[in-house]
């Protein structure tokens, strides 16, 4: 549902009379998204360095719930392992979100200079686990753990970021069944839209561990939709290469397809790989220095960008500061293109799914309600179509239209 920008309410919203342009000084841009940008800034009242997300709510009106979700979760968090939220300001249609500035960049940025060694990985994973342990104790699920959403301070402190898809578990709703996250890092039970809990974050952590070791997640050379089909079907990914036994065992523990057998974040903090290899976070400043040297040597900004990173690091500019991930909001259809019919498929994305496919499956299941194996096969097919539609909106419409065209052609050919 579209919202009027003036009606937007988020935790920590400051008096609308306050002018953020007077309270804060924008410095260089450190990130860019579909509907806004992230700037390094100065709080003119305290001289504190902050990060300023500026979102155009008129452009992002269909994503306001995601924006509110991120701000709500961040405002409820009080942990040194989660990025701090300072408040929001509304000026016209622009929402200014003031957050903690972390000058070390994201783990994805730092990976552009090369994979991490096991001591660096263990140190970073330990801090991520502390963040997850905090979130899970607060009955929150991050749901999008990956290198792009792990930020570092210039001193090497590690914090979780990007809570646009984070979920809250209540006492009466212990498991969720919504389809969110990034395909390469997504747990099997999330893809299958089964009930899931905080153990989904543990799977994503295991994939992130492989990402830190290899520079990219498993299956990053494949199309995301194909990955959505393979993750539930295939055996879990394993860490291949010259790595220690304890590191491989850590990853295997995270990537158990049965979530009930995955350890909790608290249990993983006691894992041999973490206990024996993690160091003080200041050890991670070498990664930040390495990245600065790599940039200074004139490496192309596009060299390390890959389809598997969900485009977090695309659109980088040549500046000495690592860019922040800014994936809170997604691009919506262009109204002008809609008027011209150029994006008609986007408007009708779910029409065939809701009007034809879903009712057809319901009728099939009702007809065979006493045939358990047949009903199970129907449900699996229905889930697969839902997964395909989520990964590639509009694919169901195209399939149905193609089937109708084929049927009409066959009927015409058979006519006397």
From Swiss-Prot:
The keyword Cytoplasm applies. Pfam families: PDCD10_N, Pkinase. The modification Phosphothreonine is found at residues 178, 327-328. The active site is at residue 144. Interaction with Golgi matrix protein GOLGA2 leads to autophosphorylation on Thr-178, possibly as a consequence of stabilization of dimer formation. May also be activated by C-terminal cleavage. Residues 296-343 are annotated as: Disordered. Residues 24-274 form the Protein kinase domain. SMART domains: S_TKc. It catalyses: L-seryl-[protein] + ATP = O-phospho-L-seryl-[protein] + ADP + H(+); L-threonyl-[protein] + ATP = O-phospho-L-threonyl-[protein] + ADP + H(+). It is an enzyme of class 2 (transferase). GO terms for cellular component: apical plasma membrane; cytoplasm; cytosol; FAR/SIN/STRIPAK complex; Golgi apparatus; Golgi-associated vesicle; membrane; perinuclear region of cytoplasm. Its EC number is 2.7.11.1. GO terms for biological process: apoptotic process; cellular response to oxidative stress; cellular response to starvation; intracellular signal transduction; microvillus assembly; negative regulation of cell migration; protein autophosphorylation; protein phosphorylation. Residues 331-340 have a biased composition (Basic and acidic residues). ATP binds at residues 30-38, 53. The modification N-acetylalanine is found at residue 2. Keywords: Acetylation, Apoptosis, ATP-binding, Cytoplasm, Golgi apparatus, Kinase, Magnesium, Metal-binding, Nucleotide-binding, Phosphoprotein, Serine/threonine-protein kinase, Transferase. Its cofactor is Mg(2+). One of its GO terms (molecular function) is ATP binding. Disulfide bonds: none annotated. The keyword Ligase does not apply. Serine/threonine-protein kinase that acts as a mediator of cell growth. Modulates apoptosis. In association with STK24 negatively regulates Golgi reorientation in polarized cell migration upon RHO activation. Phosphorylates ATG4B at 'Ser-383', thereby increasing autophagic flux. Part of the striatin-interacting phosphatase and kinase (STRIPAK) complexes. STRIPAK complexes have critical roles in protein (de)phosphorylation and are regulators of multiple signaling pathways including Hippo, MAPK, nuclear receptor and cytoskeleton remodeling. Homodimer. Interacts with PDCD10. Interacts with GOLGA2. Interacts with CTTNBP2NL. Interacts with RIPOR1 (via C-terminus); this interaction occurs in a PDCD10-dependent and Rho-independent manner. Interacts with PDCD10; this interaction is required for the association of STK26 with RIPOR1. Part of the core of STRIPAK complexes composed of PP2A catalytic and scaffolding subunits, the striatins (PP2A regulatory subunits), the striatin-associated proteins MOB4, STRIP1 and STRIP2, PDCD10 and members of the STE20 kinases, such as STK24 and STK26. This is Serine/threonine-protein kinase 26. It comes from Mus musculus (Mouse).
